[in-house]
Design a protein with these regions (language model features):
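N-terminal Sec-pathway targeting helices
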Residues: 1-13
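Hydrophobic alpha-helical membrane-insertion segments, chiefly the h-region
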Residues: 13-23
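Surface-exposed, glycine-biased beta-strand/turn segments
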Residues: 22-116, 125, 153, 162, ...
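Short histidine-centered loop motifs in beta-beta connectors
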Residues: 90, 97, 128-154
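Short aromatic-glycine-enriched beta-strand elements
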Residues: 112-122, 169-172
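Short edge-strand/loop segments of extracellular domains
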Residues: 121-126, 180
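Short peripheral tails and domain-boundary helices/loops at the edges of structured domains
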Residues: 129-135, 176-205
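Active-site loop architecture of trypsin-fold serine endopeptidases
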Residues: 160-172
Length: 225
């Protein structure tokens, strides 16, 4: 009797397991990470263009014509909120520039509270050793680049937006010491892995204060034969 009960229970478990497999086959499939969130390979890191100079992403190269409405660590803020000097939505649609040469890791809608987001990975070389940092551009209106694109310092990559109407237009700008791209919280008490954006760019500008204007940074247009 006990043996019959055992075999019946075993048959029931096997039957229910098979039924679950047939009704929900997706549970048996391997999961795959979004390619945008995979760690770049050593080859991809080695092929990154070197960033020899950094400039500010909004206004002029050294940050004029824009102001910092909420600074790094203020209210646990993980970046700088950059606005046009007119305030409110006066900078809506203004150009956002890549702060340095690099490669776009992510360019897409970041979800609620973010609007469009772009993340660019930069390689810095000093004494033969490479260091990698990310520049992060949040609340963009229009995205002008795709993931995988190489960009140059001063290249327009987006326009200033409102996170789909959630805020007055501004650029949420971060600098990070990460390789893998992720959207992030925007606010966090611990800032490990995040850099003070204004301080970082000021230290890596490699140009005098009077060096303004972005002409000459973009590839020259190809003339028709």
């Amino acid at each position: 009797m006990k043996r019959a009960a055992f075999y019946f229970a075993l048959f029931t478990v096997a039957f229910l397991g098979m039924l679950a497999w047939r009704l929900a086959p997706e549970l048996t499939r391997p999961t795959h990470l979004d390619p945008a969130f995979q760690i770049p390979s050593p080859f991809e890191l080695a092929s990154l263009p070197l960033a020899t100079r950094f400039d500010f992403p909004l206004g002029s190269e050294h940050g004029a014509l824009a102001y910092n409405a909420q600074r790094f660590t203020e209210n646990h803020h993980l970046g700088d909120d950059l606005n046009g000097i007119g305030g409110e939505n006066s900078d809506l649609g203004d150009p956002i520039y890549a702060v340095a040469d690099g490669r776009v890791l992510l360019a897409r809608d970041g979800g609620t509270g973010w609007g469009n987001v772009i993340i660019v990975l930069h390689a810095i070389e000093k004494n033969g050793a490479r260091r990698y940092v990310q520049s992060y551009y949040g609340h963009c209106d229009e995205i002008l680049v795709d993931a995988g694109n190489d960009v140059r310092r001063g290249q327009q990559i987006a326009t200033v937006g409102t996170a789909n109407g959630q805020y007055f237009s501004h650029l949420h700008f971060e600098m990070r010491e990460f390789v893998t791209p992720f959207i992030g919280p925007g606010y966090r008490e611990k800032t490990d892995g995040w850099l003070n954006p204004s301080d970082f760019i000021a230290k890596h500008r490699g140009a005098p204060e009077e060096d303004v204007g972005r002409t000459g940074q973009m590839p020259a247009p190809q003339s028709s034969p």
